[in-house]
């Protein structure tokens, strides 16, 4: 059987995902009464739903270059920072993420900067892992300002 080539995002995910055996053996007691809010939410802006593009069958979008672009972005975000499991615990859910951490519930946030394309208007976006979507929360062409700052 020929070896399948993985994308960089899939390779990263496979090497950093939690293993149930090591997760249980290295866990420490948590104070369940002091849980932070596990998701950052932006209440303003427009949402780009990425769920339709997470399909594992790339041929579903074979004749649609725009959908292929959305599928690549959807997979990159999911495999680098998406929710990979939901475990019930003490009356509430514990979410596991693709991103490795030292036990933090949300050690990072993922943002996308768009200079503006036919598919993604210019501005700043936050990846909403709970809903697997992009929140366009800052509608401005910030690309040139960021380039000048670098």
Feature roles, as predicted:
Residues 1-150:
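N-terminal accessory segments that position/regulate proteins before the catalytic core
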């Amino acid at each position: 059987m020929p070896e399948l080539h993985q994308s960089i995002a899939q390779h990263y995910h496979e090497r950093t995902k939690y293993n149930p055996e090591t997760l249980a053996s290295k866990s420490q007691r948590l104070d369940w009464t002091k849980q932070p809010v596990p998701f950052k939410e932006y209440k303003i802006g427009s949402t780009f739903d990425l769920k339709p593009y997470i399909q594992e069958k790339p041929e579903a979008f074979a004749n649609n270059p725009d959908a292929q672009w959305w599928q690549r972005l959807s997979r990159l975000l999911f495999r680098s920072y998406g929710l990979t499991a939901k475990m019930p615990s003490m009356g509430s859910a514990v979410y596991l993420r693709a991103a490795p951490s030292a036990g933090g519930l949300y050690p990072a946030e993922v943002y996308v900067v768009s200079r503006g394309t036919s598919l993604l208007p210019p501005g700043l976006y936050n990846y909403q892992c709970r809903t697997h979507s992009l929140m366009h929360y800052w509608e401005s062409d910030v690309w040139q300002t960021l380039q000048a700052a670098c």
